[in-house]
Each structure stands twice: as structure tokens, then as C-alpha cells.
């Protein structure tokens, strides 16, 4: 789970994801075992810094979390963000060989959450 923001104060779900979810009585153990949370900030110092697009293209994101680079055989993505970010991410993922799910119900390697996208 990546979360890219400008300022640390915009990491609205950081404490929930890092403190509350792992202690959930029903699925906390799964969160501790499987969830990788990678928050990144662009405009002030933070342990992870930079735009998600740059971190993906450079390979730093996957290197930081200890996973292989993005691969259409093994990876899937759900994206939410500004229209510009989504265009950039689609171009990057397409370049890596992933295919967009054309519509709900049709399989693809990634999908875009469009509920909050303004044009």
C-alpha cells in the first residue's frame, strides 16, 4: 500500500494503518504478516521521500520494500489520485507490460478508482 502526499500532516491514515490495524482482533495478525505500507512525502523531510512515479521508475520503491520490480505476471494495482498522477501511473504501468482493466468485471492488471477523479 503506497500513499504519496506533499506534507507529513497529509498522511491521514498513517496511525490507523501502522497502529490500529495491526492490533485488530480479527485480522491484525494478517496485517502484521502481509501488509507493506509505504508512505512517501514530497515537500518536507520524511523517511521515504519523492513522487511515487519517480520511485517506481527508478526501482527505489520495490528496493525499499524488498520486493522484485513490478511484473505483469505477479502484480496487480488499484490506483486512486489526481488526474495527472493517474495518467502518469498508467503510462508507467503500461510501459512495464501491465494492462488496464477496461471496465468493471473485465480482468486486467490494474484498475483505476474513478469515484473521486475530477476532470
Each predicted region: which residue ranges?
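Reductase modules of NAD(P)H-dependent flavoproteins
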Residues: 2, 9-119
Amino acid at each position: 500500500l503506497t500513499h504519496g502526499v506533499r506534507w507529513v500532516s497529509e498522511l491521514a491514515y498513517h496511525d490507523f494503518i501502522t497502529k490500529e490495524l495491526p492490533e485488530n482482533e480479527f485480522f491484525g495478525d494478517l496485517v502484521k504478516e502481509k501488509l507493506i505500507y509505504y508512505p512517501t512525502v514530497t515537500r518536507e523531510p520524511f523517511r521515504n521521500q519523492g513522487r511515487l512515479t519517480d520511485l517506481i521508475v527508478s526501482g527505489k520503491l520495490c528496493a525499499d520494500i524488498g520486493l522484485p520490480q513490478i511484473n505483469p505476471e505477479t502484480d496487480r494495482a488499484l490506483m486512486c489520485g489526481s488526474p495527472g498522477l493517474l495518467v502518469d501511473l498508467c503510462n508507467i504501468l503500461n510501459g512495464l507490460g501491465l494492462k488496464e482493466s477496461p471496465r468493471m468485471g473485465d480482468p486486467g492488471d490494474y484498475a483505476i478508482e474513478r469515484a473521486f477523479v475530477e476532470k
